[in-house]
């Protein structure tokens, strides 16, 4: 738990609620004070769904603090059981209500005696983990609960007759998750691999018993789904892939690993093994436009330009590799806020970036951007805000994001169509060649600057002494003109004819 002005990853209970609201016919109950129950509004706004968000707040107020929470929580659990008739109810405290140190498992046990629905308490330490880690843990807990339950009733362990896959980690409020899921389904259809389950988004908890029937598991995002894949491998020996099919090179690598995972099962079933090399070649040469674009004169204009990349571990690592090895763009600094996955992230990007930044502090990211002065930024909504402050364009490549990055149109980042979308995003995030040249010559079309120059305050002509002229180049280029204008404006107001370093600092104050 952390007190902060702004956080990249939210509190733990948000992760648990995302899991619950991704499944069909699952209800979540928050044991929370007023103020912690913003998830309903946030999800309704961002996901633009027709249905109400199936999450209820069991409010902790002064009466509850005086009498204890048991009656209110149990009553809310039973009420939702009758009203909604869900397959599963997940109870979660928030980091605030966790301070009360109540025995919520006892409340769940009491309600389970009467309830027709399954009820579980989210097994998450709200003081130690964030939204991402809590979502990963909660998904694994739900899968473990239902598979353990089915084991007692004899679980069907027979594999599907044809190659099949589980896609694990598609979530509500995920960054382009719905679009990526469609693209992954299209990819597996092209490879003649059947989709066994997609969890948790749109999945049913009653169908979790069929997870072990798949030939392999794919975890497209490292942040959420790996714990479930580990559990399925340990309990059922299911192989899993955690490579993200983002970018031309990693798409090919992912498909080759799928081939290696499928062929051993094919030999067991007495079927012919698969070879996807011709498919990779065809997609790379004719379907993905990113390959020829990276060789075009447009992309060559980016040579020598600097970028800063920041986001979750999956997207930041993938975009860094795409920029550096597929488009020849220099990545001056890349980073992630996923501190728990820092070792993997460093291993992935160490050969593609001059500097690596692991932090949850957006102020440090802002300082790094100000220091580097990149031509473009690729990050979250916070990096977009930072970019606006410094007048640097930002392409959004990772959560957290606002509503404009929940597009209604089809915008995958994964698969071969995703390579086209990423190429467009990168291209549109830079000032174009001739545009950049004209801006250097004419200084753009800043009308405020024209007005300031044509309407000087007072009639004084100010001059800069030698020291102050030497100081000006030390100021970052993107704010240098503004500093110069504001200093001259300050000098004219004060009646100062000669600008010294002292006048510059006084103007700054």
Swiss-Prot record:
Pathway: Porphyrin-containing compound metabolism; chlorophyll biosynthesis (light-independent). It is found in: Plastid, Chloroplast. Substrate binds at residues 433-434. Gene3D superfamilies: 1.20.89.20, Nitrogenase molybdenum iron protein domain, Proto-chlorophyllide reductase 57 kD subunit B. Its cofactor is [4Fe-4S] cluster. GO terms for molecular function: 4 iron, 4 sulfur cluster binding; ATP binding; metal ion binding; oxidoreductase activity, acting on iron-sulfur proteins as donors; oxidoreductase activity, acting on the CH-CH group of donors, iron-sulfur protein as acceptor. [4Fe-4S] cluster binds at residue 36. It comes from the Eukaryota. Its EC number is 1.3.7.7. Binds 1 [4Fe-4S] cluster per heterodimer. The cluster is bound at the heterodimer interface by residues from both subunits. GO terms for cellular component: chloroplast. One of its GO terms (biological process) is photosynthesis, dark reaction. It catalyses: chlorophyllide a + oxidized 2[4Fe-4S]-[ferredoxin] + 2 ADP + 2 phosphate = protochlorophyllide a + reduced 2[4Fe-4S]-[ferredoxin] + 2 ATP + 2 H2O. The active site is at residue 298. Keywords: 4Fe-4S, ATP-binding, Chlorophyll biosynthesis, Chloroplast, Iron, Iron-sulfur, Metal-binding, Nucleotide-binding, Oxidoreductase, Photosynthesis, Plastid. Component of the dark-operative protochlorophyllide reductase (DPOR) that uses Mg-ATP and reduced ferredoxin to reduce ring D of protochlorophyllide (Pchlide) to form chlorophyllide a (Chlide). This reaction is light-independent. The NB-protein (ChlN-ChlB) is the catalytic component of the complex. Belongs to the ChlB/BchB/BchZ family. PANTHER family: LIGHT-INDEPENDENT PROTOCHLOROPHYLLIDE REDUCTASE SUBUNIT B. Protochlorophyllide reductase is composed of three subunits; ChlL, ChlN and ChlB. Forms a heterotetramer of two ChlB and two ChlN subunits. This is Light-independent protochlorophyllide reductase subunit B. The lineage of its organism: Eukaryota, Viridiplantae, Streptophyta, Embryophyta, Tracheophyta.
